[in-house]
């Protein structure tokens, strides 16, 4: 039996599908309020019966974690909170850091292998030969978002478990492209691209297909002597190039007008003050705006060296759209 946390999300739901394809018995730990739209639509898309064993519980509750792990040989820890609102700092810490600490301790106690879905947010600040790699040094916590710090501290808990003898695999995906609970997480980027954008920021980021993340998380966990982080990046693209793909594939509005950085940073400064006072009128945060202008480039050489060939961003978008159309017609 294999346990998956966070199976309601993009990565977790895809890992469940890949495990079921491989004939594994899968148990899913979920909160009472869990929404399984993402997993249900994938099961429908792949024409697979729902043979998942669902167990109600929470990673914040060590007792329910221990009960969920009973009889399991492995856990894929995908559950995490993503938010860039300063008001969510405490919840980010409780979910991402304390929750992961609980998972690590439960795995140590039950002698269960752990596969941890981390993030590029934990990759160090200093590029090596123009790219951020698994070896890029982390210079400082200063200026980092609460989300970034929560993922870093969570990952440190995983490394702590490793030092205590836990068998661990860590993957660090970029912006994950794939079907999920529409209107949440990175599906918002897909829906925005499908609608089309005229204006675009000057930043860039690394993108990866959710299927690649699931396949690599599973395959890496089966390898001997797998150490450290593993960046999962299909392509590095500017946001202009990324949203242009939607125009080329689906006929969406083509991004054609660059938004200058200077006036946006003025908005960022004002928004930061309002956020501290909890008076911000916008859903978009100052951190969202800042990230739109960061030029992030990541290396996938570690995965290329083991022979893995990533899907392209175009393949990821076409796949996501196929599932999206199925959901609309459901």
Predicted regions and their residues:
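NAD(P)H-binding glycine-rich loop region in Rossmannoid oxidoreductase-like domains
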Residues: 48-95
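Active-site Tyr-X1-5-Lys
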Residues: 143-169
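NAD(P)-dependent short-chain dehydrogenase/reductase
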Residues: 162-170, 174-207
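Mid/C-terminal beta-alpha module of Rossmann-like enzyme folds, strongest
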Residues: 216-283, 305, 313-314, 318-330
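Substrate-positioning beta->alpha
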Residues: 184-185, 201-221, 227-228
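N-terminal Rossmann NAD(P)H-binding glycine-rich loop of SDR-like oxidoreductase domains
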Residues: 2-22
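Conserved Rossmann-fold NAD(P)-dependent oxidoreductase catalytic core, especially the SDR/UDP-sugar
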Residues: 90, 98-146
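Glycine-rich NAD(P)-binding loop of the Rossmann-fold in SDR/ketoreductase-type enzymes
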Residues: 60, 91-102, 149-150, 208
């Amino acid at each position: 039996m294999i346990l998956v946390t966070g199976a309601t999300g993009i990565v977790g739901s895809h890992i469940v599908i890949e495990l079921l394809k491989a004939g594994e018995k899968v148990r899913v730990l979920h909160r009472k309020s869990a929404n399984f739209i993402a997993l249900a639509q994938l099961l429908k898309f792949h024409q697979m019966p729902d043979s998942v064993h669902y167990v109600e519980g929470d990673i914040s509750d060590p007792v329910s974690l221990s009960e969920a792990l009973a009889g399991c040989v492995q856990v894929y820890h995908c559950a995490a909170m993503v938010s860039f609102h300063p008001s969510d700092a405490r919840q980010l810490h409780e979910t991402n850091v304390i929750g992961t600490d609980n998972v690590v301790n439960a795995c140590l106690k039950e002698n269960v292998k752990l596969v941890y879905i981390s993030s590029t947010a934990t990759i160090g600040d200093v590029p090596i030969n123009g790219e951020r790699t698994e070896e890029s040094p982390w210079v400082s916590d200063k200026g980092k978002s609460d989300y970034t710090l929560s993922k870093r501290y969570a990952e440190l808990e995983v490394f702590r478990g490793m030092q205590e003898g836990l068998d661990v695999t860590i993957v660090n995906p970029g912006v994950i492209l794939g079907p999920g609970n529409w209107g949440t997480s990175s599906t918002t980027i897909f829906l925005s691209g499908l609608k089309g954008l005229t204006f675009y920021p000057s930043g860039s980021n690394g993108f990866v297909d959710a299927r690649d993340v699931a396949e690599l998380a599973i395959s890496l966990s089966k390898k001997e002597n797998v150490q450290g982080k593993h960046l999962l990046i299909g392509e590095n693209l500017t946001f202009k190039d990324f949203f242009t793909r939607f125009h080329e594939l689906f006929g969406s509005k083509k991004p054609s007008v660059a938004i200058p950085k200077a006036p946006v940073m003025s908005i960022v400064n004002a928004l930061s003050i309002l956020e501290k006072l909890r008076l911000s009128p916008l859903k978009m945060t100052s951190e969202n705006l800042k990230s739109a202008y960061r030029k992030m480039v990541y290396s996938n050489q570690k995965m290329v060296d083991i022979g893995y060939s990533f899907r392209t961003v175009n393949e990821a978008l076409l796949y996501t759209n196929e599932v999206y159309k199925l959901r609309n017609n459901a």
